[in-house]
Amino acid sequence: MKLVVSVTPRNLEEAQQIDAQRFVDADLIEWRADFLEKEEILKVAPAIFEKFAGRELIFTLRTKDEGGHIQLSDDEYVEMIKKVAQLYQPDYVDFEYFSHKDKIDEMLEFPNLVLSYHNFEETPENMMEILSELTSLTPKAVKVSVMANSGQDVLDLMNYTRGFKTLNPEQEYVTISMGRVGRISRIASDLTGSSWSFASLDEATAPGQISLSSMKKIRDILNEN
């Protein structure tokens, strides 16, 4: 599994002060641009892409509807993603599929899409249908992050992930059960076929996130011969 760490600057000064060396153990960097005001995103973008030049980077604009910090219309959301993608070519571009479904045709031209779905309340009963619909669009990655309210929620998502990965071996999946009970899903991603696990450096960006240092130790232990 690849370890992903988010950067969440709230203004240009914070972005300029990021010490990229602190992220050396992360395999991917996720820029959560939703911690900024809409007008600041394109002003801060050069600093982020300069700081992490040569690193794999995910551009994410997480809206309030899916647990983020910014509220945008569908048009504003797509326009901002397109601008950043065209100007800076991040390795991955997150798109909240079910929240902005009417705009998906405008995004399919991008070969580096992460089609995502987030639910901070529950693990929906129709998880198989959700995974199936996202998979049918053949994005670069399918990402699903849902709240686990029981151990069974966690086991169900892990089983669904393993099943979909077995049937679609070329498709990248990233599935996470949020919350304390879901932490095992972050550790066992190699077993289920989930490609990434999100870890925290300073503050967690989702419930149940484990620190980068702990995740690195866990990964090293699991990879021992």
From Swiss-Prot:
Lyase listed as a keyword: yes
Signal sequence region: none
Protein's job: Involved in the third step of the chorismate pathway, which leads to the biosynthesis of aromatic amino acids. Catalyzes the cis-dehydration of 3-dehydroquinate (DHQ) and introduces the first double bond of the aromatic ring to yield 3-dehydroshikimate.
Keywords: Amino-acid biosynthesis, Aromatic amino acid biosynthesis, Lyase, Schiff base
Binding site residues for 3-dehydroquinate: S6, E30, W31, R32, R62, R186, T205, Q209
Pathway(s) served: Metabolic intermediate biosynthesis; chorismate biosynthesis; chorismate from D-erythrose 4-phosphate and phosphoenolpyruvate: step 3/7
Gene: aroD
Gene Ontology molecular function: any one: 3-dehydroquinate dehydratase activity
Active site (record annotation): H118 (proton donor/acceptor), K143 (schiff-base intermediate with substrate)
GO annotation (BP), single: chorismate biosynthetic process
Protein name as annotated: 3-dehydroquinate dehydratase
Family to which the UniProt record says this protein belongs: Belongs to the type-I 3-dehydroquinase family.
Oligomer status and interactors: Homodimer.
InterPro entries reported in the protein's UniProt record: Aldolase_TIM, DHquinase_I, Type-I_3-dehydroquinase
Record's catalysed reaction(s): 3-dehydroquinate = 3-dehydroshikimate + H2O
Residue ranges the record marks as coiled coil: none
EC number(s) stated in the UniProt entry for this protein: 4.2.1.10
Annotated source species: Streptococcus gordonii (strain Challis / ATCC 35105 / BCRC 15272 / CH1 / DL1 / V288)
